[in-house]
């Protein structure tokens, strides 16, 4: 997750990690234990190619690659992975050869990322975010208007640490969830919720 702007965030630190200062530009690599369950659940929808538009150091893309899933990695900031200086919010269409957008957006731009991703011609959009995003009035309207398909809730609170920080094994302070939209679904179908248990040691 890399913040493509300088908008302030209403909480510190973004990752809910004890003892760490807020990372510059909200850069918190996504733990593999959060990406693996999404692949397990939606593998068939990811095999058509994935765009990761806030790729950071490639944390999500590396897990996709481990499963043989091709991805296009872009980011506004150069973290040594993918194509940098690409502002997702200014992109007009998805790269060729992808049918899904999977990313962990910067918190301060989460709604903008969601709206922009949903305007793209792809079959699936999956955004990682705080479970409490469901509480916000503006986002609740977005979820209803865009027919959110599924919410995958992590049954364990995982630390999302600043890049390079040592994981001391503490439990995280934030409940994480994948918010998933599928283009081809029954009209007016209600969103479903499911839980997954992150498996420690996944890499």
Regions found by a protein language model. Give the residues of each.
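Class I S-adenosyl-L-methionine-dependent methyltransferase catalytic core
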Residues: 1-203
């Amino acid at each position: 997750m890399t913040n493509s702007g300088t908008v302030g965030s209403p909480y510190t630190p973004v990752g809910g990690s004890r003892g760490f200062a807020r990372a510059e530009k909200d850069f918190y690599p996504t733990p593999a234990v959060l990406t693996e369950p999404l692949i397990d659940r939606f593998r068939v929808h990811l095999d058509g190619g994935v765009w990761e538009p806030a790729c950071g150091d490639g944390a999500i893309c590396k897990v996709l690659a481990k499963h043989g899933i091709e991805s296009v990695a872009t980011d506004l900031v150069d973290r040594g992975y993918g194509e940098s200086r690409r502002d997702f919010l200014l992109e007009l269409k998805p790269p060729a050869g992808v049918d899904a957008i999977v990313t962990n957006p910067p918190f301060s731009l989460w709604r903008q990322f969601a709206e922009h991703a949903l305007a793209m011609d792809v079959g699936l959009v999956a955004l990682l975010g705080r479970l409490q995003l469901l509480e916000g009035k503006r986002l609740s309207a977005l979820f209803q208007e865009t027919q959110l398909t599924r919410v995958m809730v992590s049954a364990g609170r995982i630390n999302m640490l600043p890049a390079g920080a040592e994981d001391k094994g503490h439990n995280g302070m934030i409940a994480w969830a994948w918010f998933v939209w599928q283009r081809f679904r029954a009209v007016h179908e209600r969103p479903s919720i499911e839980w997954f248990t992150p498996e420690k040691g996944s890499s």
